[in-house]
Amino acid sequence: RPYACELIVAAGPCMFFISAFYYSKGANKCYPFTYSGCRGNANRFKTIEECRRTCVV
């Protein structure tokens, strides 16, 4: 799995509200979350399909 899949979700400190998806290693599932628009980390995907394709085993 890519490094992004090992990271915990991080929404970031900014004030935008962007729908995104993150991977939960413990559950081996992708979930929706609201990204703030800055910082965060690589565990952020535009679609649930992209998240699943990248991380779910």
From Swiss-Prot:
InterPro entries cross-referenced by the UniProt entry: Kunitz_BPTI (IPR002223), Kunitz_BPTI_sf (IPR036880), Prtase_inh_Kunz-CS (IPR020901), TFPI/VKTCI-like (IPR050098)
Disulfide cysteine pairs (residue numbers): C5-C55, C14-C38, C30-C51
PROSITE patterns, alphabetized: BPTI_KUNITZ_1, BPTI_KUNITZ_2
Stored Pfam families: Kunitz_BPTI (PF00014)
Entry keyword set: Disulfide bond, G-protein coupled receptor impairing toxin, Secreted, Toxin
Outcome of substituting A27S: In Mambaquaretin-8
GO molecular function: serine-type endopeptidase inhibitor activity; toxin activity
Family per record: Belongs to the venom Kunitz-type family.
Role, per record: The mixture of mambaquaretin-7 and mambaquaretin-8 interacts with vasopressin V2 receptor (V2R/AVPR2), probably in a selective manner. This mixture inhibits vasopressin binding human V2R in the nanomolar range (Ki=3.14 nM), and also potently inhibits vasopressin-induced cAMP production (IC(50)=58 nM). In vivo, intraperitoneal injection of this protein into rats increases diuresis, without any loss of electrolytes.
Domain notes: Exploits its two major loops and engages more positions in its interaction with V2R. The pharmacophore defined by numerous amino acids positioned in loop 1 (9 to 18) and loop 2 (34, 39 and 44) may be at the origin of the absolute selectivity of this protein for V2R.
Protein name: Mambaquaretin-7
